[in-house]
């Protein structure tokens, strides 16, 4: 009896639970269906037409307008309206429309098929206007407006595209393109067909430049046709324009830099030492930024992408090069700091017969530090490097030697080499390379390497790799007597707090600066020295396994109160004094004096073609 009693209670409890679960599931289904139908009903009743915000403008440091907006128009089609017309026996004249648009009937059919393919057009809805043809010109728009009434279901959507006042700065300014499915999933702000920054400043400052789109809420009838504004537009949301950006660029210098790179592969970076503001950042091959706007983008993007000279590579930020003899200045500073040498140290040099690293030419011997920089004496800097690393111990596997190498590496890194700055707004920065001791342990074994093994590092070859922007920044460190402000492109953002001190005492810079001044007055750069201007610089010629050596120069001017630090890299050009040096001097003259007086030199460098594969776009 007792068991039956408990059994009856158990059955009752299970029945109650079952009823509760059924009611719960029923309620969930009701809510789900209601919400789904409500959503469908709302989609049928309203069309939320986007009102695109004007993108922020971009200016150079002197207020010259670089990037602005121009009106463009998209031809939209609502598939349900076309379907209803066909059902009613009154389809539009597609042949006439094709004639107006300048497309074939097959192209018309292909576009319609693409619109209805949800795998490709993942935001497709027959009730929502879809993009049939984008980026119509004002002339096309005016022509269509006259005939659009003949084509129910087709409407015009206003928007803007970028345009450029100067045919330069493609790498640094960047471009905009249609957002991908992944971008839409990642950021709920975007809708299908929106544009966003793809690279450069356009990408870095996308959120500031894009503003906030608005929307116009329109009413539909039962056939999906637009009937007017919802509540007379009281619920519409107006767009908020994007924020304008004033860059640190000097467009006149940028133009000159790009002209001087014509017919060459390479880059030029100029920085204001006191502020870290980038004055110019040119990379070649390049292209007129207007070519990646509107319908031209689909034509030129694959051409640029498939060009063997890699125009999409910004060599200023992403090109990796051995710095060559320009590195000797940093080598001297670090070795002075660590006590491997003093300002009065002299080493003997036997010219091209010197071992294990030969000199490029005969000069006086023994040679002092200033003379070694002026003459670019390889043996001096090899012995400087060797003495610094081996001052506490010698031989493979010696821990004191490795400790000295680690300290040497850290001091080199403090000049902004070997890593990319995380506090910079420059797009596409690369690390470069200054090998760790542990990396050499893996390559040679823990007891398999010493200073002789890595001797090429002493003259900026071997495993030392830098980008041109890092090299220009290193010149700024020397100009500033031991610090740099992170290089940046937005002039309105004060980054003066982003000051980084090099691990070299102020007292060591004078002797190196003197040597760099001698390079430009009496040494490898003297032929192109500027009258009445003290320039401090260093030429470099770096070995290249794929052809002729690269030509490099870095420096700053004037010597007192420097206004510009610069680095020039010309690939496969030969000696640094032949090409990189005169190009740098012309850029310095342009920036400091706002004109170039050496017209013959400018024309010679501008018209000089060192690589016939480089195309002009």
Which residues does each predicted region cover?
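Beta-lactam-recognizing serine transpeptidase/beta-lactamase-like catalytic domain environment
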Residues: 67, 221-226, 230-236, 274-326, ...
């Amino acid at each position: 009896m007792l068991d039956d009693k408990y059994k009856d209670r158990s059955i009752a409890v299970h029945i109650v639970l079952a009823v509760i679960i059924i009611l719960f599931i029923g309620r969930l289904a009701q809510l789900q269906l209601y919400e789904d139908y409500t959503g469908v009903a709302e989609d049928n009743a309203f069309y939320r037409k986007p009102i695109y915000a004007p993108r922020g403008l971009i200016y150079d440091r002197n207020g010259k307008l670089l990037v602005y907006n121009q009106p463009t128009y998209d031809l939209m089609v609502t598939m349900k309206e076309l379907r209803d017309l066909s059902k009613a026996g009154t389809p539009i004249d597609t042949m006439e429309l094709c004639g107006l648009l300048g497309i074939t009937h097959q192209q018309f059919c292909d576009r319609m098929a693409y619109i209805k393919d949800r795998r490709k057009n993942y935001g497709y809805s027959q009730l929502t206007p879809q993009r049939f043809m984008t980026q119509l010109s004002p002339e096309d728009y005016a022509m269509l407006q006259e005939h659009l009434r003949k084509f129910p279901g087709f409407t015009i959507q206003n928007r803007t595209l970028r345009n450029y006042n100067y045919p330069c700065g493609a790498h640094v300014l960047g471009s905009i393109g249609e957002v991908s499915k992944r971008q839409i999933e990642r950021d709920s702000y975007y809708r299908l067909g929106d544009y966003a920054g793809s690279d450069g400043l356009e990408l870095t400052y996308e959120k500031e430049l894009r503003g906030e789109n608005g929307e116009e809420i329109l009413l539909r009838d039962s056939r999906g046709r637009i009937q007017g504004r919802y509540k007379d537009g009281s619920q519409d949301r107006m767009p908020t324009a994007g924020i304008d950006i004033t860059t640190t660029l000097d467009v006149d210098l940028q133009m000159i830099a790009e002209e001087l790179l014509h017919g060459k592969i390479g880059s030029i970076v100029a920085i204001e030492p006191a502020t870290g503001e980038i004055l110019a950042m040119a990379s070649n091959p390049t292209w007129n930024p207007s070519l990646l706007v509107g319908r031209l983008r689909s034509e030129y993007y694959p051409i640029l992408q498939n060009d063997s000279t890699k125009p999409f590579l910004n060599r200023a930020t992403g090109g990796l090069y051995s710095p060559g003899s320009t590195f000797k200045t940093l080598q001297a500073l670090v070795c002075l700091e660590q006590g491997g040498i003093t300002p009065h140290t002299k080493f003997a040099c036997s010219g091209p017969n010197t071992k294990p690293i030969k000199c490029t030419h005969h000069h006086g011997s023994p040679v002092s530090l200033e003379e070694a920089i002026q003459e670019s004496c390889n043996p001096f800097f090899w012995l400087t490097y060797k003495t610094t690393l081996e001052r506490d111990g010698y031989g493979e596997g010696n821990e004191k030697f490795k400790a000295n190498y680690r300290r040497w590496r850290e001091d080199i890194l403090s000049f902004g080499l070997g890593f990319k700055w995380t506090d910079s707004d420059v797009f596409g920065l690369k690390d470069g390379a200054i090998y760790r001791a542990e990396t050499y342990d893996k390559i040679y074994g823990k007891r398999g390497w010493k200073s002789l093994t890595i001797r090429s590092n002493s003259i900026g070859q071997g495993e030392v790799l830098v980008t041109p922007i890092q090299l220009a920044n290193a010149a700024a460190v020397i100009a500033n007597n031991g610090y740099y402000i992170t290089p940046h492109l937005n002039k309105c953002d004060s980054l003066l707090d982003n000051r980084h001190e090099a691990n070299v005492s102020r007292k060591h810079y004078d002797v190196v600066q003197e040597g760099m001044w001698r390079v430009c007055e009496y040494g490898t750069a003297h032929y192109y020295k500027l009258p009445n201007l003290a320039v401090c610089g260093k030429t470099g010629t770096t070995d290249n396994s794929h052809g002729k050596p690269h030509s490099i120069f870095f420096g700053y001017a004037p010597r007192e109160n420097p206004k510009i630090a610069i680095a020039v890299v010309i690939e496969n050009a030969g000696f640094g004094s032949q090409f990189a040096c005169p190009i740098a001097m012309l850029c310095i003259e342009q920036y400091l004096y706002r004109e170039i007086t050496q017209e013959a030199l400018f024309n010679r460098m501008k018209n000089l073609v060192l690589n016939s594969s480089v195309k002009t776009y």
